């Protein structure tokens, strides 16, 4: 039986290990938890969601919705567990954070072709290996990777997570349930603010004291997970046109849209925990309590977790990796997950999926499957391996990296729907080959 070592049991590593095992490959899965955790991890589960509990838009008019549907049709472990542990979230797919990670962990442990070895990995093993150790790779392994790749091949940015509050502590007399434009079910708690309340909150936020981030004073921040205080400093109204946007959220008490709205999204199945949408932060914890309780509905909020900030490291992938996430100079080594420069939970899963499927095919003597650029999975693989990219930055899946239609379509929503339909039709043509084990 062929053998592969997978380092890291996050979203990418778990998906990769499972896809390899499903195709008859013996997998040794190395994960440093529970012996050692990164600053962003709390539980001992695999596939722990360290930031939001949302896998973003569910519809096919969204590129991430297309990516999720492609993965579903190709028997993704992560998507199966996400769908099974979904919680109400309007037009998005959100999951019970612990229930999801527990299901992934139990599925991995129960697979006969996967052997789990806990403990920190400090060097790159011999033989075929997939490194999916994540953006918070421990220093010894990061040094081993840097030595293997040569200098100047890793970059970094900062990422942040939002606070969690208990539902019982939210003042529902000052809040209301609704989804934007009444789309889907009213799953979000909306915390309205008057102009005076918002301006006082904004002034306090931009003046609040931040936690120190040692050694990385450039404060390079990924736009998709920007700390709320960084966004606020861009201007008085930036938040009102971003995460605090009131459009489509009519307050039933006034019959009007508020001046600003803070949204809370359910974080677990029973609805006892909610997260502050768009409130990734690295303010000092006492400052978070002081500033965020200025939101009227959160004046007595019980914070179950404060926001945290951490460094994310990723590879200069276009110079290093091929479209199957393999190291060009040494193809026995592949990478997967956020460290390749894909950004987001679903994107990380997709990279692990593709790396696992293609490596299994190689070991089983089969030719690679070139996922077309018209598919979201293929577009991501081509993005991270595109050597013509000048300033490589982490990227969420988006329709901009998928080839356009050969005809004009009126309306962005209709155009995106057609792009998704084209992708899924192409996917059907290669589906059986991908699923062959």
Predicted regions and their residues:
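Beta1/beta-strand and adjacent pyrophosphate-binding region of the FAD-binding site
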Residues: 1-12
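N-terminal FAD cofactor-binding segment of flavoenzymes
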Residues: 18-80, 373-384
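Dinucleotide-binding Rossmann-like beta1-alpha1 core, especially the glycine-rich loop
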Residues: 48-59, 83-99
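Helical element adjacent to the flavin cofactor pocket in flavoenzyme catalytic cores
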Residues: 97-116
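Predominantly flavin-linked oxidoreductase catalytic cores and closely associated redox partners
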Residues: 110-285, 289-290
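A glycine-rich dinucleotide-binding beta-alpha-beta segment and adjacent secondary-structure elements
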Residues: 276-342, 349-351, 369-386, 392-396, ...
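Internal hydrophobic alpha-helix adjacent to the cofactor/substrate pocket in enzyme cavities
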Residues: 348-369
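C-terminal auxiliary extensions adjacent to catalytic cores
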Residues: 394-437
